[in-house]
Amino acid sequence: GKFVLYTDWSIDAVSAILHQEIDGVEHVIEYSSKTCNRHERNYCPTEGELLAIIYGLAKYRSYLLGQIFTIVTDHSAL
């Protein structure tokens, strides 16, 4: 089924949650997060949210490569 990658950034951490849609219902495949280093803590919101997307794509590359998927973020500019 189709994959959905949810990402988020805060000053302290980035997170990524991978879901897979099966029969119209999303099921969590894996959760992941990491703390931000001192440079990442200085990012503006757009840079931070993009960092979270890149983190999620790298973390779940093996699941997503060659698949149709959607990225969901709470930052409207992205």
Label each residue range with its predicted role:
Residues 2, 13, 24-28, 68:
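Conserved catalytic motifs of the protein kinase core domain
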Residues 19, 54-78:
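RNase H catalytic domain
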Residues 1-9:
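Two-metal-ion RNase H-like nuclease active-site motif
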Residues 8-12, 74:
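A short acidic Gly-Thr/Ser loop motif
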Residues 11-20:
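Acidic, metal-ligating active-site segments
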Residues 22-51, 75-78:
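A short, polar/acidic, helix/strand-boundary loop motif
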